């Protein structure tokens, strides 16, 4: 990792050069430097919504596909890529059936 000697910003590799995105300073990359990119993703625990936790969720008018009741708890969860919309989950306040709705 190298920082620009002019503006102290982080420099990035572009081909065989190091370039400062902020001020445009360029420097030949040293052959002895090896670029290693490591990406790690942490799996987050998905909270389970049940029992007393349900009573804290907002409710809305939605027809349950199982019993036809017209009220359900709802919550949003990001299941797909960050550039895609969230998934809306519903749980019937009467029978407990859970279903989802995509935008």
Curated annotation (Swiss-Prot):
Keyword Amino-acid biosynthesis in annotation: no
Keyword vocabulary terms for this entry: DNA-binding, DNA-directed RNA polymerase, Metal-binding, Transcription, Transcription regulation, Zinc, Zinc-finger
UniProt zinc finger (TFIIS-type) residues: 60-100
Amino acids binding Zn(2+) 1: 4, 7, 20, 23
GO cellular component terms listed in the entry, alphabetical order: DNA-directed RNA polymerase complex
Residues that bind Zn(2+) 2: 64, 67, 92, 95
Zn-finger region bounds: C4-type: 4-23
GO annotation terms (biological process): DNA-templated transcription; regulation of DNA-templated transcription
GO molecular function annotations of the record: DNA binding; DNA-directed RNA polymerase activity; zinc ion binding
CDD domains to which the protein is assigned, alphabetical: Zn-ribbon_TFS
Family: Belongs to the archaeal RpoM/eukaryotic RPA12/RPB9/RPC11 RNA polymerase family.
Functional note: Induces RNA cleavage activity in the RNA polymerase. In its presence, the cleavage activity of the RNA polymerase truncates the RNA back to position +15 in a stepwise manner by releasing mainly dinucleotides from the 3'-end of the nascent RNA. The truncated RNAs are able to continue elongation. Involved in transcriptional proofreading and fidelity. Misincorporation of nucleotides during elongation of transcription leads to arrested elongation complexes which are rescued by TFS-promoted removal of a dinucleotide from the 3'-end.
Name used for this protein in its record: Transcription factor S
Organism: Archaeoglobus fulgidus (strain ATCC 49558 / DSM 4304 / JCM 9628 / NBRC 100126 / VC-16)
């Amino acid at each position: 990792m190298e920082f620009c000697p002019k503006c102290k910003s982080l420099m990035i590799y572009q081909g065989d050069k190091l370039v400062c995105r902020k001020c445009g300073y360029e420097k030949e990359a040293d052959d002895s430097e090896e670029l290693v990119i490591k990406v790690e993703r942490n799996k987050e625990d998905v909270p389970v919504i049940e029992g007393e936790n349900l009573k804290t969720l907002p409710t809305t008018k939605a027809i349950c596909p199982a019993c036809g009741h017209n009220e359900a708890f709802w919550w949003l969860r990001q299941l797909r890529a960050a550039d895609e919309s969230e998934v809306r989950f519903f749980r019937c306040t009467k029978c407990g059936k859970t279903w989802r709705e995509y935008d």
